[in-house]
Amino acid sequence: MSQEDKGFPAEVVEIIGRTGVAGEVIQVRAKILAGRDKGRVLTRNVKGPVRVGDILILRETEIEARKLKPR
């Protein structure tokens, strides 16, 4: 299996806010730790409990989440 088949580790560096109809999704900034985009910081949506320092396994590193709009 290649690295692309397993996923890419990313560390949560900042929690931006909550989104979704009931606030069930958390938007975070995550730094890619390995692979082609190592060192790049992405904005991603995460479902479930998460805190700064957690490691996420991302299937891909191309797509970023849309920015949260202030209300």
Curated annotation (Swiss-Prot):
<dbReference type="GO" id="GO:0030490">
    <property type="term" value="P:maturation of SSU-rRNA"/>
</dbReference>
<comment type="similarity">
    <text>Belongs to the eukaryotic ribosomal protein eS28 family.</text>
</comment>
<dbReference type="InterPro" id="IPR000289">
    <property type="entry name" value="Ribosomal_eS28"/>
</dbReference>
<dbReference type="GO" id="GO:0006412">
    <property type="term" value="P:translation"/>
</dbReference>
<dbReference type="GO" id="GO:0000028">
    <property type="term" value="P:ribosomal small subunit assembly"/>
</dbReference>
<dbReference type="GO" id="GO:0003735">
    <property type="term" value="F:structural constituent of ribosome"/>
</dbReference>
<keyword id="KW-0689">Ribosomal protein</keyword>
<keyword id="KW-0687">Ribonucleoprotein</keyword>
<dbReference type="InterPro" id="IPR012340">
    <property type="entry name" value="NA-bd_OB-fold"/>
</dbReference>
<dbReference type="GO" id="GO:0022627">
    <property type="term" value="C:cytosolic small ribosomal subunit"/>
</dbReference>
<protein>
    <recommendedName>
        <fullName>Small ribosomal subunit protein eS28</fullName>
    </recommendedName>
</protein>
<dbReference type="Pfam" id="PF01200">
    <property type="entry name" value="Ribosomal_S28e"/>
</dbReference>
